[in-house]
Amino acid sequence: MQLITEQVQKSMEGSSWIRKMFEKGLELKTRYGADAVCDFSLGNPDVPPPAVTKDVLETIAADAVKPLGLGYCPNAGIPAVREAMAQYINRQQGIHDSEVRCNAGHVVMTVGAAGALVSFFRAVIEPGDEVVCPAPYFVEYASYCGHFGGVLKTVPSKSEDFSPDIEGLAAAITPRTRALLVNSPNNPTGAIYSAEVMAKIAKLVDDVNAARGESGRPLYLLSDEPYRAFAYDGVTVAPVLPLTKWSIVLGSFSTTLSLAGERVGYIALNPAMPGVETLAAAVTLTNRTLGYVNAPVIGQRLVAGLLDTTVDLGIYDRRRKLMAEVLTAAGVEFAMPKGAFYFFVKAPGGDDLAFTDALYEERILVVPGRGFGGPGYVRLSCSVDEQIIARSAEGFKRAVAKMKG
């Protein structure tokens, strides 16, 4: 008896390496105790939310007992929250041109950035359509577009700094390509794409759309930005909306406010985009018909009250620097991440599975890079206490020595 679809069965059998390492981590922690395991496998933000979160929640709680205090809201989100988000995005993107300034009508509140992507793909993808993105990439992208018969096409990035290969992206685009998806700061590499690179990507999108003409289906530039606030060493994250009218920004507050469980995100459409009202209406519809209905009301109001603050990003920077010291002392090769809170490091000898196993024997959990389209590397998350990072130092040395021996 076939209980589930072949597509889901295949997905279950090839479950993500993050999930596999999570399960292996549970085995280690059960056997040796949680304090004896250094778990760098999950990107679960652990820094406390801003202190003002409590005050905002108290205000929300007072309103919650009023009639419809926690009732349905418009499918696109609470109007006042959408307007606040629009102004936040304008500031974040450095938008001063009135033609490109967002208002509430250009913003849809979603169930996390993931919900934004899924709702967008449902609105624009037909079976056989393609989404092109640089690799390594966030592991779930393929599933998000695959739900609707879409195909994720990945293009290897430049190995020295994980910068996108512009020529490779251009070569991957076909008449069936509906979106070019970028993620900067990047998960899993921590790379931040330069303003020059982003300008070239935007020009590529404009050139493709010029060739397709007004009667063709447009190519969209999707910028997935949940880690935008996580930029170090004076590096800035290039804005996308001013670069091309075909740009769309997605984001969430899982990391910047440590609200991962609240599942609040957004999608912001470029106001200068032809047909922007139609696309906004379509994403609002798919946000509802996919079963999300509307983003969580408490989460929306909470985010609106916290837009001018973030978690203590200095904590993540200190962890980043400590992790770099540990890896350097162990002889691990890596590009220093400029953003997010991940390291994507070379596996000695190029075998990411063998390196993952060697670290596992030292009770250190990482994720093989092949799970992100980057074989030969492993991903480490710095969303852990500094004591755990320091405690892993000798284990890294032994694992590297074993790989090189």
Q: Predicted regions: what is each one?
A:
Residues 4, 8-112, 119, 299, ...:
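N-terminal small-domain helix-loop-helix segment of the aminotransferase-like
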Residues 27-33, 92-97, 204-218, 271-276, ...:
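Alpha-helix termini
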Residues 37-39, 250, 333-338, 370-371:
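Short beta-strand
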Residues 67-216, 228-243, 389, 394:
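Conserved core of the PLP fold type I
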Residues 87, 91, 170, 354-357, ...:
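PLP-dependent enzyme catalytic core of the Aspartate aminotransferase-like
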Residues 245-317:
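Conserved core segment of the aminotransferase class I/II
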